[in-house]
A protein has these predicted regions:
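Active-site scaffold of zinc-dependent metalloenzymes
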Residues: 1-58, 72-73, 86-89, 98
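Compositionally biased, intrinsically disordered low-complexity segments
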Residues: 51-53, 64, 124-126
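Active-site recognition of the HExxH zinc-binding catalytic motif
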Residues: 60-72
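Active-site catalytic pocket residues across diverse enzymes, especially alpha/beta-hydrolases
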Residues: 74-78
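Post-HExxH zinc-binding segment in Zn-dependent metallohydrolases
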Residues: 80-121
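Glycine- and charge-rich intrinsically disordered segments
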Residues: 118-134
Length: 134
């Protein structure tokens, strides 16, 4: 699913843990066995990945990853300033000034889409559980 933050195109994907691990290893470093990710924002490809193996967490994970995407889109990352150790109150206020309205709009727009995906995953899980019992 394609969407925009400012003029930057982003893609939202719902993926399995296995797919998420592959993306992590491609972009960052080898994955440690037993670890898992609920979500991942890849600024270099403008992609947000949401782990569909955890349907109950999808909404909060999307909100979290969307903030990473907003920070990347508006070049507000503290990683851009190697001397900066954390965000100040002023930094956070500037972030909300620059992209707060857009962030809130996107959260509202994606809420029904994420709910639909979550419900589809839960229905599939319920069918799998019912099949195993029979």
């Amino acid at each position: 699913m394609i969407f925009y933050i400012g003029s930057q195109e982003w893609e939202l994907k719902f993926v399995t843990q296995e797919e998420m691990n592959r993306e992590w290893e491609t972009e960052f470093e080898p994955f440690i066995d037993g670890e898992f990710l609920l979500g991942l924002t890849i600024a270099t490809t403008s992609t947000i990945l949401i782990n569909k193996d955890f349907p109950r967490r999808m909404s909060s994970v999307f909100n979290h990853e969307l903030m990473h995407a907003c920070i990347a889109s508006y070049h507000l990352s503290k990683s851009d300033d190697t001397n900066k150790k954390c965000y100040t109150e002023e930094d956070i206020c500037n972030l909300m000034e620059v992209c707060g309205d857009e962030y809130c709009r996107l959260v509202r727009e994606f809420k029904p889409i994420i709910e639909e995906e979550k419900n589809a995953v839960q229905i599939k899980e319920n069918r799998t559980t019912s099949t195993r019992r029979n």
